[in-house]
Amino acid sequence: MTHISTHRPRIAVIGGGIAGLTVAASLLRAGIECTVYEQATVFADAGAGIQLAPNSARILHRLGLAGALERRATRAHAIETRRWRDGAPLARTELGASCVERYGAPYYLIQRADLHRSLLELLPPGVVRHSAACTAAEERPDGVTLRFADGTSEEAGVVVGADGIHSALRNTLVGDRPRFSGHTVHRGLVAADRLPSLFEVPKVLFWLGPNGHVTSYPIARHGLVHFSAVITSPEWDPEVWSAPSRPEEAAAAFAGWNSDVAELIGAAEGTHHWALFDRDCVGGWSTGRMTLAGDAAHPMVPYLSQGANQAIEDAWVLADLLGAADVDPGPALRRYEELRLPRVREVHRRSRERGHEFHLPDGPRQRLRDRSMPTAERLDDYAWLYGFEAAPVGSR
């Protein structure tokens, strides 16, 4: 059993999503007491899928989740990219055993709720407090006062804001606003037995076309296939982040695409329409007693499928540094930002660029992209991403 130190300041984690629970699990593994404050009364059973690349899967294995992932996730055998109209293959990246051999962990496909449940199982009872919506944090030299929506307050020695792109703590530390990417996405789930020819072997499928793309993959043992159908949408009400939609709306946006795309979207029982926001990847989110993690620190568009993966890296690095720190957490928090900022800036930049490349209209630039893809999508070319080792101190 991990020994919990009584000499370090107690840490408050704001937000009980993937980022917050991974921060908590990593801190507890490092012997640091923490409490997670979650605004929801109960955790929702969210249906969306997550791609867990080897850079985060290795960390989850170290946290003790290898068995849970093998039970609840699916190992992807490949990533395939196809043309929008005729489904012609553009590239195929082999994963499977090659991925494990090259990067030390599989490439997992999992339902978000299953990953969340697995992380929650790592935490002792009482670590997560529900109905605790943090609205403000006031830092002093000797601690932080947290203010909650119900009028109550709590004291903590260190605060980690892992409360997503709407982060209240980020508003205090940075003060910027989310940026609409110009893209929206229809997400849905389909029974896998409706699409037997597409997913006989578990894989991630992309279809690229003018002003849009579709991503799809099976998620774990549920017999379901997740899809995200992204379209260029220059206008969106900034006050509305998501809304229920109908599969017919998504199908209309992809009229004329390959029959596999039409079949995939048409087989969904329901869809949800989301606007995709990010922020510019700036620093300044760590002080002497407060910092951010995950989307609160560096929200990014999902075109490298790295949002959750980068949050998991954040959690491991932060806990590693705090575990090696003395009573004063300030140097560790500032070092955490120094280490993470170059990494997330690169992932953030490449994610934005990939979104533009995915949506090229048919023409010379699209043809150049397509010709280059078979050599640009090799497994070794992802060493910068999947091979990154997020362990600055190595104390664990």
UniProtKB/Swiss-Prot annotation:
One of its GO terms (molecular function) is monooxygenase activity. It catalyses: 3-amino-4-hydroxybenzoate + NADPH + O2 + H(+) = 3-amino-2,4-dihydroxybenzoate + NADP(+) + H2O. Keywords: Antibiotic biosynthesis, FAD, Flavoprotein, Monooxygenase, NADP, Oxidoreductase. GO terms for biological process: antibiotic biosynthetic process. It holds the Pfam family FAD_binding_3. Its cofactor is FAD. Part of a gene cluster involved in the biosynthesis of thioplatencin (ThioPTN) and platencin (PTN), potent and selective inhibitors of bacterial and mammalian fatty acid synthases. Catalyzes the hydroxylation of 3-amino-4-hydroxybenzoate (3,4-AHBA) to 3-amino-2,4-dihydroxybenzoate (3,2,4-ADHBA). This is 3-amino-4-hydroxybenzoate 2-monooxygenase PtnB3. It comes from Streptomyces platensis. The gene is PtnB3.
